[in-house]
Amino acid sequence: MKPFIKVGALSVAVIAAAVLAAAAYAGPAAPDVPEAIAVPEGNKVFLVGEAVGVQIYACNAVAGGYRWDFVAPRANLYDERGMLLTTHFGGPSWQARDGSLVVGTVVDRAPVAGAIPWLLLAAASTSAGADGDRLAHTTFIQRIATTGGLAPAEASCHAGTVGTQAEVPYTADYYFWKATGSGS
């Protein structure tokens, strides 16, 4: 005789709740991006933040004229509830509230009309912080949905402005990835 398992409405509800909880725990969905900045298989999104900040440029003298050169970003990244997740600064680097840090290097870019390009960055180095390791397992970072941040008009960089800096407002969404199956 085969064993018989009686499944009642309560059992079905418990199973359904477990399935929904597992789906919710799966983490944020991967964004739809151009092929040039797609993250390789074997990675999954674990954190998404909306950046609000500035791209900093310096006016420099160059052979035959003057030019605005990129210096660094300065931004805060927030979650969907408006809670601060990380700060973003030169390197390019991101530091979480727990002190963990990731430094990225640009792998590729996708141009965007009227804004700084979308980027794929690989984690060049990571470290845990004194209070946790939120960013310590990062493998890739994507910068997408950019607005603003472009260098000032070339004409505004001249002999009278050499050595000055300009802070240009920008926003972007940053997706942080880790290897599938990695910790935290």
Positions of predicted regions on the chain:
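Bacterial N-terminal signal peptides that target proteins for export
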Residues: 1-11
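Bacterial N-terminal signal peptides
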Residues: 11-19
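Primary mode marks residue(s) on the alpha4-beta5-alpha5 output face of response regulator receiver
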Residues: 27-54, 63-184
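Sec/Tat signal peptide C-region and signal peptidase I cleavage site
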Residues: 22-26
